[in-house]
UniProtKB/Swiss-Prot annotation:
Any Pfam family the entry gives: FimA
Family that this chain belongs to: Belongs to the fimbrial protein family.
Protein name stated in the entry: Protein FimA
Chain ranges passing through the membrane: none
Species this chain originates from: Bordetella pertussis
UniProt key word Heme: no
SUPFAM superfamilies, per database record: Bacterial adhesins (SSF49401)
Domain of life per record: Bacteria
GO cellular component: pilus
Gene3D superfamilies: Fimbrial-type adhesion domain (2.60.40.1090)
The encoding gene: fimA
Localisation: Fimbrium
Length: 145
């Protein structure tokens, strides 16, 4: 998913967010046994995860979104999921990620869930922010009973 272009001034203070964009992860054709059960995403650890803030490091990219080589972290800006620290990469209980109810798909005999998240930019430091394209990523697994 792609966040919108924002002005550097939209991120005035450390912790301020901008460019919030909703994205969905849709689960389809779930087994009937999951009907009424809670499912969620477990965000994996990796090189893009800032374990201190719970956000994703943002890396400089070219105009096509291709990361610079070697990777260069953007100063004082990161990517945030869900408007609060999810503690990406930590164990399931410590992540505090939301869960979603599996239900029957309207007009169908199948079951599924739509997992809705919000991604945004977040100011992570007090120094200057350099304009440019940024990129980040995180792996995830689906958690279910």
């Amino acid at each position: 998913m792609q966040l919108p272009t924002i002005s550097r001034t939209a991120l005035k203070d450390v912790g301020s967010t901008a460019g919030g964009t909703v994205f969905d992860v849709k689960l389809t054709e779930c087994p009937q046994a999951l009907n009424g059960q809670q499912v969620g995403l477990f965000f994996e650890s990796g090189g893009t995860v800032d374990y201190t803030s719970g956000n994703l490091f943002a890396y400089r990219a070219d105009s096509q979104g291709v990361e610079q080589v070697p990777q260069t972290k953007a100063d004082n800006v990161q990517a945030n999921l869900d408007g609060s620290a999810i503690h990406l990469g930590r164990n399931k209980g410590a992540q505090a990620a939301q869960t979603f109810l599996v239900s029957q798909t309207a007009g169908s005999s199948t079951y599924g869930a739509t997992l809705r998240y919000l991604a945004c930019y977040i100011r992570s430091g007090a120094g200057s922010i350099v304009a440019g394209n940024l990129r980040s990523q995180v792996g995830f697994s689906v958690m279910y009973p």
